[in-house]
Structure formats: structure tokens, C-alpha cells
């Protein structure tokens, strides 16, 4: 079974932990629990390859900016998440998360993930957002941001309804497998076996 280390990053309260819990347990947590660092494991088969997926959850709050990179060494793929109903979290992908990943883990594949699409599609929720002058992020904006940051793919999902949730993790594994297929056998990247190190 091939091990793959996936680290999920993004602003606080964008739904990172809910994604992981919903994916690994098929149950949506009913309350917000701020994360410091949590690890989960999942086994899956992607394109006939058996994968032991190590899922590393991180805290998005600024208080953890110095601790969070401790979970980065040996990362195979990042999920960079933003909430489609929180434009500031979308802007922070380019302003904060991409630079942080580039500093610690250049050349590690990124999947850009737009979360909470169930809320964007709910007329009542959209009305509430409009009252706060919030316009939800739409798919073309996610596609554009993915190109800007060099992400392998942009996927939208909902941890609540599980729409596209499995696809997020399958595509993350595919990004790792595709990168491995392109690398010369036995060649190590600068900074360690996977091109991600801590300085």
C-alpha cells in the first residue's frame, strides 16, 4: 500500500476539519471545533493503486502561523481551501497560503478547494449573505485562481451533503501519482525525499 501525506490548509472556519471528518466517518460534525493539529487516516484505491492516505488537519488562525509549518515536511499534496461564502478566505489563498506553501514546500502539488457550496446554492443563505454585502465566489473565479497559483485542479465540495467530497481526495492522490510518474526513478528533490522541508 502506497503512503500519501495530504495536508489541508486555509483560513479558520472554512470547513477543513468538517471535510476530513465527513470524508473519514461519513458524518458531519454539528458544532465548530477549532483545530490545532489533527491527523486522520484513510485507505482508498485510485486508478488501481492502493493508497494509505494520511490526512493532516491544520489550524488556519494567525496564532498558529509559526506552528503550522511543523506539519509540512514530507507532504505529498496540499489541499488549499477557501469558503465560497467568505471572499476574504478566497483572497488569502493567493495572499497567504500559496506563499506559505512556496516557502516551505515548493513543487508540491496543490488542489484548490472551494467549500460550503451547499450554502451558496441555498436561496435563504444567499439572501442572508446579500444583506451583509457578501457575494459568493462562483466556479469561474475558482478556476481562475487555480491557474494563478499553479494548482493542479479546482474542485468545489460540500462536507454537509458530501457533494464532490470523495472527488477532492481522489484528485489529490491522482496529483501525487502523476507527479511521481514524471520524476526520474531514484532521484530525490532538493530538501528531502518529497521536496518539502522545514527551514
Curated annotation (Swiss-Prot):
Enzyme Commission number(s): 3.6.5.2
Activity regulation summary: Regulated by guanine nucleotide exchange factors (GEFs) which promote the exchange of bound GDP for free GTP, GTPase activating proteins (GAPs) which increase the GTP hydrolysis activity, and GDP dissociation inhibitors which inhibit the dissociation of the nucleotide from the GTPase.
Keywords recorded for this protein, A-Z: Cell membrane, Cytoplasm, Cytoskeleton, GTP-binding, Hydrolase, Lipoprotein, Magnesium, Membrane, Metal-binding, Methylation, Nucleotide-binding, Prenylation
Segments carrying motif Switch 1: 26-37
Residues that bind Mg(2+): 17, 35
Binding site for GTP: 13, 15-18, 32, 35, 116, 118, 159
Motif range (Switch 2): 57-75
Any one GO cellular component localisation term in the record: plasma membrane
First-tier enzyme category under EC: hydrolase
GO biological process: actin filament organization; cortical cytoskeleton organization; establishment or maintenance of cell polarity; mitotic cytokinesis; regulation of actin cytoskeleton organization; regulation of cell shape; signal transduction; small GTPase-mediated signal transduction
Membrane protein topology class: Lipid-anchor
Protein location: Cell membrane; Cytoplasm, Cytoskeleton; Cytoplasm
Propeptide boundaries: 197-199
Necessary cofactors: Mg(2+)
Function: Small GTPase which cycles between active GTP-bound and inactive GDP-bound states. Involved in actin cytoskeleton remodeling during capping of surface receptors and uroid formation.
Record note on domains: The switch 1 and switch 2 motifs undergo large conformational changes during GTP/GDP cycle and play important roles in the interaction with downstream effectors.
Family of the protein in this entry: Belongs to the small GTPase superfamily. Rho family.
Name of the protein in its database record: Rho-related protein racG
Protein species of origin: Entamoeba histolytica (strain ATCC 30459 / HM-1:IMSS / ABRM)
Lineage: Eukaryota, Amoebozoa, Evosea, Archamoebae, Mastigamoebida
Amino acid at each position: 500500500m502506497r503512503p500519501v501525506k495530504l495536508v489541508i490548509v486555509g483560513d479558520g472556519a472554512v470547513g477543513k476539519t468538517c471535510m476530513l471528518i465527513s470524508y473519514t466517518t461519513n458524518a458531519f460534525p454539528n458544532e465548530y471545533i477549532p483545530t490545532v493539529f489533527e491527523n486522520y487516516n484513510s485507505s482508498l484505491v485510485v486508478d488501481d493503486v492502493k493508497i494509505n492516505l494520511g490526512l493532516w488537519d491544520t489550524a488556519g488562525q494567525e496564532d498558529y502561523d509559526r506552528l503550522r509549518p511543523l506539519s509540512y515536511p514530507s507532504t505529498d499534496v496540499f489541499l488549499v481551501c477557501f469558503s465560497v461564502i467568505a471572499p476574504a478566505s478566497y483572497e488569502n489563498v493567493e495572499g497567504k497560503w500559496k506563499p506559505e506553501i512556496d516557502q516551505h514546500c515548493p513543487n508540491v502539488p496543490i488542489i484548490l478547494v472551494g467549500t460550503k457550496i451547499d450554502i451558496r446554492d441555498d436561496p435563504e443563505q444567499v439572501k442572508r449573505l446579500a444583506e451583509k454585502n457578501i457575494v459568493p465566489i462562483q466556479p469561474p473565479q475558482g478556476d481562475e485562481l487555480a491557474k494563478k497559483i499553479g494548482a493542479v485542479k479546482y474542485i468545489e465540495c460540500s462536507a454537509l451533503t458530501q457533494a464532490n467530497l470523495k472527488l477532492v481526495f481522489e484528485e489529490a492522490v491522482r496529483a501525487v501519482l502523476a507527479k511521481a510518474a514524471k520524476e526520474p526513478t531514484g532521484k530525490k528533490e532538493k530538501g528531502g525525499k518529497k521536496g518539502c522541508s522545514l527551514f
